[in-house]
């Protein structure tokens, strides 16, 4: 049971949400009085309450989603709130739906989407993983951050071949190393206001670090937003190489580290937007002609469930005709399907760019 103190904080938080007429988050949309009363007294075995779930969305009324999961159990204990949010965000993934088993598929069906190097500047595929038996950021203790780091570091440093590289802990990092990692665009900073409010930055920088291979085409973020963010990337459009590298790396890490997976929601992550495959496959691509007609660009992208952003992030424009284009769907389909849909869509966009006037 949540303590009386937590429940009274929750009552105040609920009132604040109700009075915020300019708040349009999914949290506000689905945290009805009925759902609130049903959940306000609950607490997970690891000590998480509804307050941990909603605090970021209450503090940041301009949130799009507004909720995070403090631990794996939260997705089931607070399902009355999470389920409708997940269904809304993941376009109809109903409480009765299930994430298919993990399936990376036949890597030989992937190709270099731009062999002439005319359009695609770079390609990147990432996934998130949580370690089984540990809560997510808001409920982690300092010692747990250190434990997770040491388990993962050992496994990463045993990698061989093209994955071989070095682990750089954020704690005690020298200025030179810091500068190099910033120049490579590898260094992550302490979380933004949404993550701060969700208490995702506790004991910073304890237990946080970055691993990258010598060729700088493979990267792992340890204890940033998720326990692990595993990233494969390179210049050009060779999706087969990029995805293949990610699949190999996940397999190596999995030999020693058990990941948190739910039968219905797939791989569990701190933010419900990343659930399921957790995969974001993206390219930076030059589409000057198509970009001049944004409506047409969005139309082709939507047909393949692709998200179009400027390269500076979510809400940025693209004055130079370069876009960050990625798969929108992560939940309710296999890893293979998510990446294949992105490949098909990119090929179609290149075709449309070539035929644009």
Curated annotation (Swiss-Prot):
Molecular-function annotations in GO: arginine kinase activity; ATP binding; creatine kinase activity
First and last residue of the signal peptide: none
Protein name: Arginine kinase
UniProt: ATP binding residues: 122-126, 185, 229, 280-284, 309-314
One protein family per Pfam: ATP-gua_Ptrans
Residues at which substrate binds: 64-68, 225, 271, 314
The keyword Nucleotide-binding appears for this protein: yes
Coiled coil location: none
Enzyme class: transferase
Start and end residues of each Phosphagen kinase N-terminal domain: 9-91
Enzyme Commission code: 2.7.3.3
Cofactor or coenzyme needed: a divalent metal cation
Catalytic activity line of the entry: L-arginine + ATP = N(omega)-phospho-L-arginine + ADP + H(+)
Domain Phosphagen kinase C-terminal: 119-356
Organism: Trypanosoma cruzi
Example of a GO biological process term: phosphocreatine biosynthetic process
UniProt record similarity statement: Belongs to the ATP:guanido phosphotransferase family.
Sorted UniProt keywords: ATP-binding, Kinase, Nucleotide-binding, Transferase
Cellular component terms per the entry's GO annotation: extracellular space
């Amino acid at each position: 049971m949540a303590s009386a103190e937590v429940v009274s904080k929750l009552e105040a938080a609920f009132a604040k949400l109700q009075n915020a007429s300019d708040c349009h988050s999914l949290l506000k949309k689905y945290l009805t009085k009925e759902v609130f009363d049903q959940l306000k007294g609950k607490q997970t075995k690891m000590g998480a309450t509804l307050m941990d779930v909603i605090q970021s969305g209450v503090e940041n009324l301009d949130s799009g989603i507004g909720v995070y999961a403090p631990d794996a159990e939260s997705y089931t204990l607070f399902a009355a709130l999470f389920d409708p949010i997940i269904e809304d965000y993941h376009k109809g993934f109903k409480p009765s739906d299930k994430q298919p088993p993990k399936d990376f598929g036949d890597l030989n069906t992937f190709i270099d989407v731009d062999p002439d190097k005319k359009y695609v500047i770079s390609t990147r595929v990432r996934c998130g993983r949580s370690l089984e038996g540990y809560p997510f950021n808001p409920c982690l203790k300092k010692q747990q951050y250190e434990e997770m780091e040491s388990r993962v570091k050992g496994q990463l440093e045993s990698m061989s071949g093209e994955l071989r590289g070095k682990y750089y802990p954020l704690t005690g990092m020298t200025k030179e190393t810091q500068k190099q990692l910033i120049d490579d665009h590898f260094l992550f900073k302490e979380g933004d206001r949404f993550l701060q409010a969700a208490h995702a930055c506790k004991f910073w920088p304890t237990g946080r670090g970055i691993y990258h291979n010598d060729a700088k085409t493979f990267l792992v973020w340890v204890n940033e937003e998720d326990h692990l963010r595993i990233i494969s990337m390179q210049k050009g459009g060779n999706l087969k190489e990029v995805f293949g590298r990610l699949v190999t790396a996940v397999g190596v890490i999995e030999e020693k580290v058990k990941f948190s997976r739910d039968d219905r929601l797939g791989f569990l992550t701190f933010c419900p937007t990343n659930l399921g495959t957790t995969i974001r496959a993206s390219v930076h691509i030059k589409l000057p002609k198509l970009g001049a007609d944004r409506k047409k660009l969005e139309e082709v992208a939507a047909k393949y469930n692709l998200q179009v952003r400027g390269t500076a992030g979510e809400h940025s424009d693209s004055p130079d005709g370069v876009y960050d284009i990625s798969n929108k769907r992560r939940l309710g389909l296999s890893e293979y399907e998510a990446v294949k849909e992105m490949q098909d869509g990119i090929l179609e966009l290149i075709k449309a760019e070539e035929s644009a006037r």
